[in-house]
Amino acid sequence: MGTELMRICVKEDSDDLPSVPPGFESYATFTLKRVVPATTSDKAKTPAIESVSATEQAKMEVESDEAKAARALRRRPWINHSGCDDDGDCAANNDNAASQNPDQNCDVKPALPKGVVRGCEECKDCQKVTARWHPDEARRPDLEDAPVFYPSEEEFEDTLNYIAKIRPEAEKYGICRIVPPPSWKPPCPLKEKQVWEGSKFTTRVQRVDKLQNRSSMKKISKLPNQMRKKKRKCMKMGMDSVTNGMGDPCSASTGMNELETFGFEPGPGFTLKDFQKYADEFKAQYFKKSETSTDDKCKVDNSIDCWEPALEDVEGEYWRIVDKATEEIEVLYGADLETGVFGSGFPKISSSHNASSSEDKYAKSGWNLNNFPRLPGSLLKYEGSDISGVLVPWLYIGMCFSSFCWHVEDHHLYSLNYMHWGAPKLWYGVGGKDAVKLEEAMRKHLPDLFEEQPDLLHKLVTQLSPSKLKTAGVPVHRCVQHAGEFVLTFPRAYHAGFNSGFNCAEAVNVAPVDWLPHGQIAIELYCQQGRKTSISHDKLLLGAAREVVKADWELNLLRKNTVDNLRWKAFSAKDGILAKTLKARIDMERTRREFLCNSSLALKMHSNFDATNERECCICFFDLHLSAAGCRCSPEKYSCLTHVKELCSCPWVTKYFLFRYDIDELNVLVEAVEGKLSSVYRWARQDLGLALSTDVSGSKMEIDEEGKVHKDPTPQTTALSGKDLQLKVTSKEVSKELEKTSKLSHVNLLLKEKEEQITSSHCMKPVKEETVCDSSDPNVSACQPSEGGIICMTAVKSASGKKNSQSLPNDVILLSDDEYDIPRKRGSVRRDAISSGKKLEIRERPTHVLALEASAKIAAPICQREGDSLRDTRNTISLPTNDQKTMRRDVPSSTSHAEVNAEATGLTQDICNRMATNSHGGGKPTSCKSKNSGGLAIVDVVDGTRSSSGTPSCSQNNSPDRFIRQKGPRIAKVVRRINCNVEPLSYGCVLSGKSWCSRRAIFPKGFRSRVKYINILDPTNMCFYISEILDAGRNSPLFMVYLESNPSEVFVHMSPTRCWEMVRERVNQEITKQHKAGKSDLPPLQPSGSPDGFEMFGYSSPAIVQAIEALDVNRVCTDYWDSRPYSRPQVQFPANPLLREANTSGRSNVGNLQLNPGHHISPTGINSILKVLFKKASMEELSSLQEVLSETNSDMVTELVKEEIQNRR
């Protein structure tokens, strides 16, 4: 019970001391009266005697007037002579003199008689309530009620959706009440006997009369001699407490430190059963009608009239006590009880199977406050730790008059409060738009308290009458919460209230997307006030953005129309709350970086920088999830970008900056959130680790709660997923893997040799670089695709023009992924930076080559190609990039490996492999602009050549005003059947799965065909198109069409029909454009349905269909064969019927590819078929085959193969 001593020490009764030296007080009046010496009875007063009424005290003073004192002859009553006396009597009287003659400049409130006395000699849990309610002086505020909502059963199913629905109506009030449907009655585990009678909780002592009307603590103790008096008094009380077993004397000095602030002291512990008894006794005694009572305080129940005051009476009495109390009213409140320790009032999901279906329903409900913070759509799901009171609910067990003072939620979050049982709880709310008005009104009415504690509203210990707020122009609304009802508070809405009796409520926070702007304001205020944060706002903001990108990816590419994806898709808009908040935050970050970080070292922040513990600025406690500043003098000490100069006194050159993302990457994220599909594609691959192909790394993928995909890489895999997964390879291995068309993407790499050792603190630095791709270079060899770009190899020559002999086989690997939405500026080749071969660096650039735009319900990314002129793999050329900041990382020379961040990109790798074999060169360079064709943006990628002026050679910005207006192009009125002469190039292999076939056709992976159609670049001519089926990942095919003469023109979709429909739309777009330019002899606009996608792929050709059917020997394509129960494959076809030489321009007739028993394949065909088979085999299988062929007769092998074929048939 040492807390009792603390409470006594902080008391202000009879401890009010003047603020000037004794004997020099100035009095308002000069009434002469005799000085009354202290009597023996005065010294022996007990706390019970001190609580007598003011009338009795006046009577005692009149009776004591008869006593004579030697010093009563002094004629100067305005001078306090008691301070000059040396005898013990006058010294003992100093306290009384100080309390009777207060300093006029120190507005210390006079002591009030005790209205509640807790504990006695017989028991410590009883109470004596001497105060009585004053119905004639009630001060019930005249307020409007907050809105009440009654959701239907259907509306009640989706918690956050319903809150979003009522927000426009309720937010202006700051608070509202939600009454669940009558059928929603969750069981309460707290009412179980073992909890009700066995679990104890702690309470807080609240002085209701001091919530509004109290003096500043600084005015109570100003002088040292007065402090000594209070200390002596506390020590004396401490000794008495020790005698009574209540504490120890040293506790008194501890209490002295708390004189500087006002707060709620800890109270005794109770069980729910005992606290209900205590609360009911208080209310019954305070509001009882009759004055009859027994002398035994512990049996006060016998004299209580059993009646319940009206709620209006309780409200009026409460605000009378707060406004103008006549007694000390002390109550207890079980506030902020952690449900993780004491237990929740809602059922939790149990691992046992004994739970009933009804309990399971409530345990999984979105209105269960244990589930509420992390519901789908709440940003708090991205907070990994269980923050008590924010993500873990708190319990509030109240009694009559127990209060919660004016405050807003941490980070201005939403809060939801549910009352499990008990008397009503009265709430008062002020809308977020009026929060500043309330703060100004409270500072005006309580200036001394705010001067002493500027952050007083953060302490939750100050109340102010709603009537006074209303007078000050602050709109306040009342809300009465009953058992079984919810109360919802909105962001930055101030709220306060009290309980009208014994009750139990539970509350927790939530953060829907519309909270983000309020949360941003909150952290800026916290930074100014130097207040600690509870959650990482930037982490939640980026988590929401990633979720939107992931939803866009799954909806557009995987057709996952789930409820969660549709919910997040709704936030994917340029003018949406998420996009605006993210853009504002990035603009703020850009400004700070440009202002501070231009001349300093910038490093890549590790992904686990704040994974285990929150990183905060050591100056203002700003969250450091996105960026931080540090110094070498203190490795574990960081600051925000604003306070980097105050971090330490070291020179500026010793400082460094940590960035989770560079600004270009963040800009990509903004575009992705705004709905730009190219940015969605790039960010999904770059940050989330999502890819359309999973063949490259045969690894398992797991998606965490933030939407990131984590893969478990295999030892042979060189293509990695995720930004932070790194693979070390030697330069020879890099060269070898590139020759094997290794799948490397996502990161721009610039590898150089390094002679000196570089410390880890110099691992990344911002650099600028412009490069140009020169197609006239005879050393142009091959390009590998990166994410939206390509990897090119070229020999780096020294300044003398000779090839650097120290360079490795593929000296420089530059992965450029620049996407240009505007005409690019001319750059210069930075060969001087890499010719010396003295440093090994890694340079990263954001992706800028893929351009995808969502213009249909379902679309897929365009995987582009660059460079029409591709030859043998020998050297590397630089690719054009924007003039932009990039990040450079120096790698220590002690290792012979390059740390390569890479990502699996099976789709782009497959495209690139065919670029080297199918490209004939000579294609016209086109500008890298997105052209909306109705289904997807068609991307023209700038190839190796471009004009020196930087102007695109084929611009799409032709204005209609530049040409004479003509009538529009003709439209074909009849859909004519195109004579499709489809030429199969490769039949591929059949895969099992419903997505790899339909009732109409089988879709073999790797199938390729060739057909002639209108040229999208020159509609007056026809050209050849290559149709191909790729593996899109997630066990589904992806259909791709591209120009054989210009592989940079790519059309990709999940449907063959839609894929060719996009080609038709692009043709019509070009026809319209050239018609406006005045060109004649143009074909008519192609109507919808012409051409047919299945026909253009070759599925109308019986020979091709039969060849594909023959591939499915085991009939794994069940949907296709179920629709053809009497069909069976007639003959086997080779998987690769036609392998053309790269330099062959002739066309082979492949109509008669059917193999008869006597058919002989040419030696070239045999080699090609064997190569295909060998590539499908593993190293172990190839080694075994080599041993068998070297030691066994070939005839035996032939017989075994024939036997196996017969068995499989």
From Swiss-Prot:
Residues 974-1032 form the FYR N-terminal domain. Zn(2+) 1 binds at residues 617, 620, 640, 643. Residues 146-187 form the JmjN domain. Keywords: Chromatin regulator, Dioxygenase, Iron, Meiosis, Metal-binding, Nucleus, Oxidoreductase, Repressor, Transcription, Transcription regulation, Zinc, Zinc-finger. One of its GO terms (biological process) is chromatin remodeling. It is found in: Nucleus. Fe cation binds at residues 407, 409, 495. Gene3D superfamilies: 3.30.160.360, Cupin. It holds the Pfam family zf-C5HC2. GO terms for molecular function: histone H3K4me/H3K4me2/H3K4me3 demethylase activity; histone H3K9 demethylase activity; SUMO binding; zinc ion binding. Binds 1 Fe(2+) ion per subunit. Residues 875-884 have a biased composition (Polar residues). A motif (Nuclear localization signal) lies at residues 217-224. Residues 1034-1124 form the FYR C-terminal domain. Transmembrane segments: none annotated. Functions as a histone H3 'Lys-4' (H3K4me) demethylase involved in the negative regulation of gene expression. Active on H3K4me1, H3K4me2 and H3K4me3. Not active on mono-, di- and trimethylated H3K9, H3K27 and H3K36 in somatic cells. However, also active on H3K9 when in complex with MMD1, a meiocyte-specific histone reader. Together with MMD1, promotes gene expression in male meiocytes in an H3K9me3-dependent manner, and contributes to meiotic chromosome condensation by triggering some condensin promoters (e.g. CAP-D3 and CAP-H). Interacts with MMD1 in the nucleus of male meiocytes, especially on pachytene chromosomes. PANTHER family: LYSINE-SPECIFIC DEMETHYLASE, PROTEIN JUMONJI. This is Putative lysine-specific demethylase JMJ16. It comes from Arabidopsis thaliana (Mouse-ear cress). The lineage of its organism: Eukaryota, Viridiplantae, Streptophyta, Embryophyta, Tracheophyta. The gene is JMJ16.
